[in-house]
Design a protein with these regions (language model features):
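Feature primarily recognizes SF3-like P-loop helicase cores of small DNA viruses
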Residues: 1-193
């Protein structure tokens, strides 16, 4: 509806006018998450935190300062990854939810939208129940063990240097040994291939 906006999360960081589309919106949906690492994360972190005024700029107009209350929902076959931000702040702002693989025997329901529309009152009650729980938890989401595992796996997957250092075929830690950085770098580049 009017309170939502469809956009690429990558565009929020790479296009200076993109944040203007999020003004007065409650949710932004990226329905096909680009697997390219985000070059920056400053805008996304500021929007998610919703405590800092941001520069909202429209083409051919004076930029203004404003608060954006939008929340991001990103769907994809991978995780949101930052090229240069490995801070806790980037990761702690994410809740990673996985879904079951599609059953090969599943038959798609062509009437799913109609059936869900009929269930709107029940879905609304379900959402209000979740809102009451969120308020009772002082605006802290309940994070499932699976979501914690998903986040830990995403963090490990994005940290290839640690993975390299744990690759025993390339790196061995023994007392009283040393190696030249050029040899270590060659081993790292070979491991990356």
């Amino acid at each position: 509806g009017e309170a939502s906006h469809s956009e690429s999360i990558l565009r929020i960081e790479t296009n200076r006018f993109a944040s203007a589309n999020l003004e007065y919106k409650l949710v932004m949906v990226d329905d096909d998450l680009n697997m390219v690492a985000l070059p920056e994360t400053r805008n996304i972190k500021s929007i998610v935190t919703a405590e800092d005024r941001l520069c909202i700029e429209r083409k051919n107009k004076q930029a203004v300062q404003g608060l954006l209350y939008v929340r991001f929902i990103c769907f994809g076959n991978g995780n949101l990854v930052a090229a240069h931000d490995d801070s806790d702040g980037f990761w702690r702002r994410q809740i990673l939810i996985t879904v079951k693989d599609r059953d090969p025997a599943r038959v798609d329901n062509p009437f799913l939208i109609e059936e869900l529309s009929e269930e709107r009152p029940g879905i609304l009650l379900w959402m209000l129940e979740g809102l009451h729980r969120l308020l009772a938890n002082r605006y802290q989401f309940t994070i499932s063990e699976r979501s914690i595992q998903n986040l830990e796996a995403a963090m490990a997957d994005s940290d290839n240097l640690t993975q390299f250092m744990q690759a025993s075929a390339y790196v061995r830690f023994k007392p009283d040994t040393e190696e030249r950085s050029t040899y270590l770098y060659r081993a790292y580049t070979k491991w990356c291939e």
